[in-house]
Regions:
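Basic, alpha-helical interaction scaffolds
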Residues: 7-53, 512-585, 634, 638, ...
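Short, conserved micro-motifs composed of acidic
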Residues: 401, 488-518, 619-625
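Conserved pre-catalytic core of RNA-dependent polymerases
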Residues: 174-175, 182, 202, 206-431
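Surface-exposed loop/turn segments and immediately adjacent short secondary-structure elements
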Residues: 6, 10-22, 31, 35, ...
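Arg/Lys-enriched, amphipathic patches
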Residues: 1-168, 206, 210
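Catalytic palm subdomain of template-directed nucleic-acid polymerases
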Residues: 359-376, 412-413, 455-485, 500-503, ...
């Protein structure tokens, strides 16, 4: 839908009035028992029709799907130019043709100017989004933004191979194969022996009342604009641009859902979009799937998530930093670097086992998940509602503009669901508690005998030990206990680092020996056994070079101002270069390498060559930059300030004083 049009206040008001009228009609119908709106399913169907109807009537649909940044105003000007061109072609006399060509020249000029303005606005918006992603440390989103700006999306292969390796050429066969692939991927084998997990003796202080209007409004505001709609075709903007009306409607709907303890069937359905990765695009395994779920359903999930995290977050261990407020990858990377550096300084043996789980989010047994939620004190009412959103959940794959046959998903967290990350954290937390319960197999962390067993970021686990025996014991216990929840360790991607160790025996799993390495890319940063950061800086320089080259068309574009180009450089190139720089141990030589890279790229963007005799200081002033050394130092002090303001139990804060 054309939600860019609601920036026009008159259109926005028309949209809200139409929605109000439709919702009022729905409310009047609800008072008529014959219309059977007393169930959440019927009420939802009528509500969906109201939203879609208002969007269709007032806004209409986009005509230019391949270039979404082109505004409706530009599309109108392009159509006007096309009509004028037809007039030129139909002209019968030279005089008529000259007059028509003059009009066409003006129409062409207006269309080009409008498109150029759209492109500038789009680049500015992408730069803003890139800055936000960089500030959050979300490198995946930043990479996707870079690819959009570069305009170099991989074309998905028309033909794919079946399990036997034969090419499938018909769309029907391909859709069937895609459904078969994702059905296998999203339905992992159950654990051989499920654990007996007792429920908490007392529930956490989590409200089990129906969602309030304030909660609904807050959840709607948290929705990200520009995201795709789910099976119900209701985009986030439909709710955000009719805040009061949507809040009232969802309040009535959620009340019915809360009473009956279940959600509409359509909310249990997901549409899978295929995103190509590296490698042979004829192979299904070289794609990842993104599930599109109902946006109103996400509002309910957001409310439940807020209630759960507010009460249950403190139950998680301090070692876990994934998907939690005021914690980041930098905390874990810095802590691990300090541990390695101090171990070398004190000539202390150290084992680090970087664990990788195979299809982690998709493999958790759901019955175990419900039991763990009750074990952590989540009230039965909340668990029941979440459970019912999973019961009967199905997916369909979008292929060639068509949908595959639906298939049921019976294991793991739902892809695209806001609740999945935190539910996964509880499972990993329970597993690690069982692994380390009553054990002292970690590294000495205090003078009072306290030990640090592991560093966790969601499913990225780094097990720590001083001896081979302790690391081997802990690894085997993790393998066994994780298996009871459905989690399986991927031996091929699990790696061990050791330093100053007398034993040469390998660390093993039931499936074989774990490979030993001298460096490992941990949470995006290269960690080496020598404790240095030179390898990481080299890797960041290579990644930043690739990012800069991908945006070559941006640097050459005459329609974009230098200010916009500098913003894009800062958000999409410089942030890639300086990712994790607050954890670096820099020298003058390493700082110079980083500065040379930045200077060279800034000179190209600003069109400055060596003959212009522009000093580096003047270059930085023109580009609004500080030196690389000052920037890195500032990032370090920002992280240190943030860390020391946290509680005494913070692992990263303790690491600053650990020796």
């Amino acid at each position: 839908f054309l939600f860019a049009e609601v920036t026009n206040e008159q259109i926005a008001e028309t949209f809200r009035i139409l929605l109000t009228n439709k919702f009022q009609a729905l409310s009047d119908l609800g008072r008529d028992q014959e219309n059977n709106l007393d169930t959440y399913e019927h009420f939802w169907e009528k509500s969906k029709t109201a939203w879609n109807g208002a969007c269709e009537e007032v806004l209409g649909r986009r005509k230019c799907q391949d270039k979404p940044w082109i505004s409706e105003n530009s599309i109108k000007k392009i159509e006007e130019r096309k009509k004028v061109k037809e007039t030129v072609n139909r002209a019968k006399t030279r005089q008529q043709k000259q007059a028509a060509q003059q009009i066409y020249h003006e129409a062409h000029k207006e269309a080009r100017t409008s498109i150029r303005n759209d492109k500038r606005a789009y680049a500015e918006e992408m730069a803003r989004m890139g800055e936000e992603a960089a500030a959050k440390g979300n490198m995946r989103e930043l990479y996707e933004i870079t690819r959009k700006l570069a305009g170099k999306w991989k074309a998905t292969s028309g033909s794919i191979r079946d399990q036997a390796g034969s090419l499938l050429t018909t769309q029907q066969d391909q859709a069937k194969r895609w459904a078969e692939y994702f059905e296998t991927l999203l339905n992992q084998p159950p654990p051989t022996g499920k654990p007996n997990i007792p429920a908490a003796t007392e529930d956490l202080d989590i409200s089990c009342d129906k969602p309030t209007r304030a909660e609904i409004k807050k959840a709607i505001k948290a929705l990200k604009s520009g995201k795709s709609a789910g099976p119900d075709n209701i985009p986030p903007e439909a709710l955000k641009h009719s805040m009061e009306e949507s809040t009232e409607l969802l309040h009535s709907l959620f009340e019915k859902i809360w009473q009956e303890g279940d959600v509409p069937k359509e909310w249990k359905e997901g549409y899978i979009v295929k995103i190509p990765k590296k490698g042979d695009l004829h192979e299904c395994s070289n794609y990842r799937g993104i599930s599109l779920l109902s946006v109103p359903g996400k509002v309910l999930n957001r409310i439940i998530l807020e209630r759960i995290t507010l009460a249950a977050d403190h139950r998680l261990t301090e070692q876990q930093a994934g998907f939690r407020k005021h914690r980041s990858c930098s905390d874990q990377i810095t802590t691990l670097r300090i541990i390695i550096e101090q171990s070398r300084e004190w000539n202390s043996s150290l084992y680090v086992n970087f664990i990788d789980f195979e299809k982690a989010f998709d493999s958790i047994d759901r019955e175990v998940l419900w039991a763990i939620m009750r074990h952590y004190g989540i009230p039965e009412k909340i668990v029941s509602i979440i459970k019912n959103t999973y019961v009967g959940a199905t997916c369909r794959v979008i292929h060639g503009g068509q949908l595959s046959e639906p298939f049921e998903v019976k294991t793991g967290g739902r892809q695209g669901c806001l609740l999945t990350p935190f539910l996964f954290l509880m499972v990993v937390d329970w597993v690690m508690r069982k692994v380390t319960e009553g054990k002292k197999t970690g590294i000495q962390w205090s003078l009072w005998g306290e030990q640090l067993e592991d560093l966790d970021f969601a499913d990225d686990l780094a097990l720590l030990s001083h001896t081979h025996q302790h690391m081997q014991e802990k690894t085997r216990r993790l393998e066994q206990i994780a298996a009871t929840t459905g989690l399986r360790i991927n031996r091929a991607k699990t790696k061990v680092m050791r330093m100053i160790c007398k034993s040469t025996q390998p660390i093993t799993l039931n499936t074989g020996i774990i490979e030993e390495v001298s460096s490992f890319t941990y949470l995006g940063s290269v960690v080496s056994i020598d404790g240095g950061t030179e390898a990481d800086i080299k890797a960041r320089l290579n990644k930043a070079t690739v990012a800069f080259r991908m945006l070559d068309n941006i640097w050459k574009a005459k329609s974009l101002s230098k200010r916009t180009k500098i913003r894009i450089f800062n958000s999409n190139v410089k942030s890639v270069l300086l990712y994790g720089s607050e954890t670096w141990r820099t020298t003058k030589a390493l700082s110079k390498k980083v500065q040379v890279f930045i200077n060279k790229r800034l000179r190209r963007i600003l069109g400055i060559n060596w003959q212009d005799r522009v000093t580096n200081e003047e270059l930085w002033a023109r580009a609004g930059q500080n030196s690389a050394e000052d920037t890195i130092r500032g990032r370090k002090w920002t992280w240190i300030g943030h860390t020391i303001r946290r509680g005494q139990g913070c692992i990263a804060r303790q690491a600053l004083k650990w020796t």
